[in-house]
């Protein structure tokens, strides 16, 4: 066995090449493999064509020694992944009785007749380790031929994700003889750019060995993935905590959460933890702030209400923004944002009022440039207004405004 696994992911399905779906499976698998120290060098997508798939396999065999396939394990004629791999490797397909019984049981429970082609899903490569599919019909497979690993996974993410985490990942670790415990933690930051964060942590990043530090910028946020390995799991955790403490000592003011969380999820949690409610006056954002909150469970306990106050008439008549403020300073102003935040808080009886006013484009407004944004945040004791200048598309500016509003709301709750 070679000391290093060079992995390649081959996604099978013409729908990928037609742009009908996005290949999120490759992203997920790459991330999961990185957590156990397996490097992915290539992503390949190929349509439902046996000749082209066979050629893709041959190319992968020349440059990779761990080839993972996703898709093409279904019952229809265009599902040809395992047949093509069997032909390429000179293997037979054999019926897996356990998988076949599971398929039959599914049809019995649903009261449907099983068509003959469903039996095809229970066929596996002879000599392979079978990966149980608890959320679908087609089992996965793992087989080693000479020094190369081959893994076959179903295409639907709802089946692939649990199969990989519960079946494939432990099996890969076993096959690779991994003794070290590899643990990762993701730190999430907002309000600081990737370049500034890397500058502030330059010496830590330059000296990284164990744990490794991997920055990633995405949609106005920055994440740091810390990955440590050691045979003693407690030592792995200690290494991570030690490095995390050094990082947060420098840029902790921008840190908001771990793992796959988000600003809206953390802000919602903070509102619940503090027993507070928020109400929104949304001019620029047009209801986006409240939409993001209500996408999460339990929003009724934290969101009192939201007013989409796009016109000056609604700003005045519903939220009490003074005519003098609008005529002297305009709707896109610090003064207007302040009165809107206070107005919606008082109108709804909420603990916190938040307001959004600005210019999303494409044209300037009342002398204010595209991207100028004011966010008001009001409590019974104090009202603050934050001024920002964003760039990007109309929708991008609105999304950025909501994120910064959540950022300011979260900071307010942390300080209280």
From Swiss-Prot:
SUPFAM superfamilies, A to Z: CinA-like, Molybdenum cofactor biosynthesis proteins
Chain segments annotated as coiled-coil in the UniProt record: none
Gene3D superfamilies: 3.30.70.2860, CinA-like, MoaB/Mog-like domain
InterPro entries (alphabetical): CinA (IPR050101), CinA-like_C (IPR036653), CinA_C (IPR008136), CinA_KH (IPR041424), Competence-induced_CinA (IPR008135), MoaB/Mog-like_dom_sf (IPR036425), MoaB/Mog_dom (IPR001453)
Domain of life of the organism encoding this protein: Bacteria
Homology family: Belongs to the CinA family.
Protein name as annotated: Putative competence-damage inducible protein
Source organism per UniProt: Bacillus pumilus (strain SAFR-032)
């Amino acid at each position: 066995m070679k000391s290093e696994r060079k992995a390649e992911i081959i996604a099978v399905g013409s729908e990928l090449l037609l742009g009908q779906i996005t290949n999120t499976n490759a992203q997920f698998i790459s991330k999961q493999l990185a957590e156990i120290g397996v490097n992915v060098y290539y992503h390949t997508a190929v349509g439902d064509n046996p000749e082209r798939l066979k050629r893709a396999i041959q190319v992968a065999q020349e440059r990779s020694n761990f080839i993972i396939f996703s898709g093409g394990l279904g019952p229809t004629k265009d599902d040809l992944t395992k047949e093509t791999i069997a032909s390429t490797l000179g293997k037979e397909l054999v019926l897996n009785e356990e998988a076949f019984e599971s398929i039959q049981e599914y049809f019995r429970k649903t009261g449907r007749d099983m068509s003959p082609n469903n039996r095809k899903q229970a066929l596996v490569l002879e000599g392979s380790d079978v990966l149980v599919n608890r959320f679908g019909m087609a089992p996965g497979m793992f087989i080693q031929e000479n020094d190369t690993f081959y893994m076959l996974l179903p295409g639907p993410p709802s089946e692939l994700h649990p199969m990989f985490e519960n079946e494939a990942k432990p099996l890969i670790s076993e096959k690779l003889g991994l003794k070290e415990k590899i643990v990762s933690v993701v730190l999430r930051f907002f309000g600081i750019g990737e370049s500034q964060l890397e500058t502030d942590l330059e010496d830590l990043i330059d000296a990284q060995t164990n744990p490794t530090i991997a920055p990633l910028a995405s949609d106005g946020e920055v994440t740091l993935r810390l990955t440590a390995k050691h045979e003693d799991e407690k030592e792995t955790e200690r290494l991570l905590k030690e490095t995390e403490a050094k990082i947060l000592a420098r840029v902790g003011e921008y840190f908001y959460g771990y793992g796959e969380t988000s600003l809206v999820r953390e802000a919602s949690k903070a509102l619940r933890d503090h027993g507070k409610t928020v109400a929104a006056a949304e001019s620029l954002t047009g209801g986006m702030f409240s939409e993001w909150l209500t996408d999460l469970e339990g929003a009724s306990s934290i969101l009192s209400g939201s007013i989409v106050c796009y016109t000056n008439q609604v700003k005045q008549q519903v939220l009490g923004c003074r005519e003098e403020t609008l005529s002297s300073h305009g709707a896109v102003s610090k003064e207007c944002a302040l009165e809107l935040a206070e107005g919606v808080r008082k109108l709804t009886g909420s603990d916190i009022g938040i307001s959004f006013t600005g210019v999303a484009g494409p044209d300037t407004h009342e002398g204010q440039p595209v991207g100028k944004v004011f966010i008001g945040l009001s409590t019974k004791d104090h009202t603050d207004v934050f001024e920002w200048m964003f760039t990007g598309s109309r929708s991008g500016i609105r999304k950025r405004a909501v994120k910064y509003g959540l950022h300011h709301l979260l900071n307010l709750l942390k300080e209280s």
